[in-house]
Design a protein with these regions (language model features):
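A detector for small-residue-rich transmembrane helices and their helix-helix packing motifs
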Residues: 1-212
Length: 212
């Protein structure tokens, strides 16, 4: 049985979390209607440019939206669905406890750092998905649960255990071998670091949580 506070809220009461999921679904719909190449041309971290001799993937440069937008691009239905489910599982807890501005801040930190570290990790390549933000949310929840118990509603400890194991297994290459596709380890670790760092900043700024 859940206590009333543990019951997930309606989407209207957690606007930041709901917006993140809605944008991912919108981009997925655009990919179906307009084609994945069109969407990637606008949202991928590394745009394709003609460098004088051939077409190459290049860094985002001053196309600042690209530091964030790859998180909304998914490669397959399961990729989209599971990431959105994890965003909801972690996001509503953060947003209910800390307010939408802090939740959005953790999202932005997770997206920017996760995408940046993935680019450094893999070099110019096409990558995407909300998994880095998932780990940012998870990392923030994990830290808050240990440093400031009671600030946010914590998920079952088994979920944290699963997420830590998944993070480490991803490094082994086993998931790619058994058909899960390429794993964005850089995004996972970057998002996790961003989430932990964001939680440290939040706890240092506030003696108690509040809606912002």
């Amino acid at each position: 049985m859940h206590s009333p506070l543990e019951i997930p809220p309606r989407w209207q009461s957690v606007p930041a979390t709901s917006l993140i999921i809605a944008l991912a679904l919108l981009v997925a719909a655009a990919s179906e209607l307009l084609g994945k190449p069109f969407v990637l041309d606008w949202l991928a971290y590394t745009p394709v440019e003609f460098t004088g001799r051939r077409f190459e993937l290049v860094p985002p440069g001053d196309q600042y939206w690209r530091y964030i937008t790859p998180v909304f691009v998914h490669f397959g239905l399961l990729h989209l669905v599971f990431n959105c489910l994890w965003i909801w599982e972690f996001g509503w807890r953060l947003e209910r406890g800390l307010g939408w501005t802090h939740c959005l801040g953790i999202f932005l930190a997770g997206a920017i750092v996760g995408n940046g570290l993935q680019f450094w990790w893999s070099g110019p390549s096409i990558f995407g998905g909300l998994s880095g933000v998932v780990y940012a949310f998870m990392g923030a929840l994990w830290w808050l649960g240990r440093v400031r118990p009671g600030w946010v509603i914590q998920p079952p400890s088994a979920i944290f255990t699963f997420m830590w194991i998944w993070l480490l297994v991803g490094l082994t290459g086993v998931l790619e071998i058994i058909g899960f596709g390429a794993i964005a380890n850089g995004a996972h670790f970057g998002g996790l670091l961003a989430g932990l760092g964001s939680a440290v900043v939040i706890t240092s700024l506030h003696s108690k949580p509040g809606a912002h």
